[in-house]
């Protein structure tokens, strides 16, 4: 039996452009697995918030719809601020700029299959997907201004 393999990275010059929607369609209609670069970071953030006494239900809220809401137990920091500083200021700046790439690329190289990465935000992430034999799809939503670009977040 021949196993087909494909790696697709999604990026957009503007937030809320439909990357998750496209990833959902690829997952639902074509059997892709969604493997985000931020998966390990999200687990770290959830563990940190749990240690502060934030309930799993509230963590789920803060990690999705409530990303910009102050979290009292975290001295008023938002989920987004916590995740961005852990991911960029600590992970990328202190440990290694490629810290979040290995789990995704290793998963793809070991398990293969159809994989979509919907959270490509930096140039090294973009290049890692291409270097692994994948392709990059630019998602553009009419009416959204180009507030950020790959490598600028």
Regions from the PLM with identified roles:
Residues 147-153:
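Conserved small/polar residues in nucleotide/adenosyl-binding loops
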Residues 19-20:
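Walker A/P-loop
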Residues 27-35, 53:
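Post-Walker A helix-loop "phosphate-sensing" segment adjacent to the P-loop in P-loop NTPases
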Residues 10-11, 117:
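Hydrophobic anchor at the beta1->P-loop junction of P-loop NTPases
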Residues 33, 102-146:
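ATP-dependent NMP and nucleoside kinases share a basic, alpha-helical "lid"
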Residues 39-113:
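ATP-dependent small-molecule kinase phosphotransfer cores
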Residues 15-16:
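Walker A (P-loop) phosphate-binding loop of P-loop NTPases
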């Amino acid at each position: 039996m021949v196993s087909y393999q494909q790696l697709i990275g999604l990026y957009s010059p503007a937030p809320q452009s439909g990357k998750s929607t496209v990833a959902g369609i690829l997952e639902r209609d074509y059997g892709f697995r969604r493997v985000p670069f931020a998966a390990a970071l999200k687990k770290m953030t959830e563990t940190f918030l749990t240690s502060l006494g934030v309930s799993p239900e509230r963590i789920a809220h803060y990690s999705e719809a409530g990303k910009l809401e102050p979290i009292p137990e975290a001295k008023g920091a938002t989920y987004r601020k916590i995740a961005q500083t852990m991911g960029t200021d600590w992970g990328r700046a202190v440990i290694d700029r490629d810290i979040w790439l290995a789990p995704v690329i290793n998963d793809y190289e070991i398990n293969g299959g159809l994989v979509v990465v919907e959270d490509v935000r930096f140039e090294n992430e973009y290049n890692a997907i291409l270097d692994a034999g994948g392709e990059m799809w630019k998602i553009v939503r009419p009416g959204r201004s180009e507030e950020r670009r790959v490598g600028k977040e």
